[in-house]
């Protein structure tokens, strides 16, 4: 059973635990290693991309009656913020710099993330505005998502080796003018040491990442977000909620708030975070530092 408070697994999740080594590298693995350990075909890993969801864009007020664990504090801490088990989790929308209402209702998070990466040189409000339903960028995101799904289907039919989702996703990113890494890394989510490793990667300055959130609940699928870091600031784009901005040393707190939002309001608990680094090769922004420096929430 998964414990929302400390992010650890009890005996019912032994199959999940067995996929992680006990040699000190338990926080991070490449997807090919995960496939070997779990005796799964690599193409079956994270092939549910695009199954996205969100509650309406309401306030972050939490109905305690719906929270069976009585969760009001969290120990999903990051040492970068010197959090302790009793520290409250900051409401996610405190970090938000731009909204993105109703853009992902059809589950096109991969396409929306790709479009966001292409528009990094713009301002936060502009980046979100061009992704709203009815815009050309939103239609383009839907086409990219459809292309990804068709590629995955074709790869499965051809019995191609490797992760079908990873290959399809990388193809649409390259077609968009981006340069995705040839490898993904999966991090266990929940303990402070593992969250620190996620933060250390995403907060590298400068860097751009496509990030997949894997959930504990069976059939919950995987949700895709994106991050960009430059000049000591990290921007996170979640197609369900919008854009969030923090100083890079506070990325851990942002992820805690994101996890709390999905857990409390969507009943989805993050079990793993999968990262893929993107070299920003878009012709309109050859230097990542060109993207506008939004004023972080303090």
Swiss-Prot record:
Per the record, the GO terms for biological process are:
proteolysis
**Compositional bias annotation for Low complexity:** 65-80
Which CDD domains does the protein's record reference? C58_YopT-like (cd20497)
Query: What domain of life is recorded for the organism?
Result: Bacteria
Keyword terms, alphabetized: Hydrolase, Protease, Thiol protease
User: What's one Pfam family the UniProt record gives for this protein?
Assistant: Peptidase_C58
Q: Where is the composition biased (Basic and acidic residues)?
A: 1-14, 137-162
Q: Active-site positions, per UniProt?
A: 109, 223, 238
Q: What class of enzyme is it?
A: hydrolase
Protein EC? 3.4.22.-
One Gene Ontology molecular-function label: cysteine-type endopeptidase activity
- Stretches for region Disordered: 1-25, 59-80, 137-166
Quote the function comment for this protein.
Answer: Potential cysteine protease, which may play a central role after invasion of host cell.
Q: Read off the NCBIfam families from this record.
A: yopT_cys_prot
The family line of this record is:
Belongs to the peptidase C58 family.
In Swiss-Prot or TrEMBL terms, this protein is called Putative cysteine protease YopT-like blr2058
């Amino acid at each position: 059973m998964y414990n929302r408070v400390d992010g650890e697994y009890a005996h019912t999740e032994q199959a999940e635990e067995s996929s992680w080594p006990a040699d000190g590298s338990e926080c991070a693995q490449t997807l090919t290693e995960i496939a070997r350990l779990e005796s799964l075909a690599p193409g079956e890993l994270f092939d549910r991309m695009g199954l996205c969801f969100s509650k309406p864009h309401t306030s972050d007020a939490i109905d305690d009656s719906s929270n069976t664990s009585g969760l009001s504090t969290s120990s999903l801490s990051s040492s970068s913020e010197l959090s302790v088990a009793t520290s409250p989790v900051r409401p996610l929308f405190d970090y938000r710099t731009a909204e993105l209402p109703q853009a992902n209702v059809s589950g096109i998070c991969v396409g929306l993330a790709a479009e966001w990466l292409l528009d990094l040189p713009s301002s936060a409000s502009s980046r979100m505005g061009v992704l709203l339903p009815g815009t050309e960028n939103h239609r383009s995101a839907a086409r990219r998502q459809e292309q990804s799904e068709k590629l995955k289907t074709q790869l499965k039919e051809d019995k191609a080796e490797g992760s079908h989702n990873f290959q399809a996703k990388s193809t649409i990113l390259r077609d968009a003018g981006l340069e995705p890494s040839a490898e993904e890394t999966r991090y266990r989510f929940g303990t402070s040491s593992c969250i620190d490793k996620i933060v250390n990667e995403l907060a590298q300055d400068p860097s751009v990442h496509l990030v997949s959130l894997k959930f504990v609940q069976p059939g919950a699928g995987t949700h895709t977000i994106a991050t960009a870091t430059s000049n000591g600031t990290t921007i996170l784009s979640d197609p369900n909620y919008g854009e969030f901005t923090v100083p890079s040393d506070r990325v851990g707190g942002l992820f805690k708030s994101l996890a709390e939002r999905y857990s409390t309001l969507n009943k989805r608990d993050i079990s793993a975070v999968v990262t893929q680094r993107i070299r920003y090769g878009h012709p309109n922004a050859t230097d990542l530092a060109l993207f506008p420096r939004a004023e972080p929430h303090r």
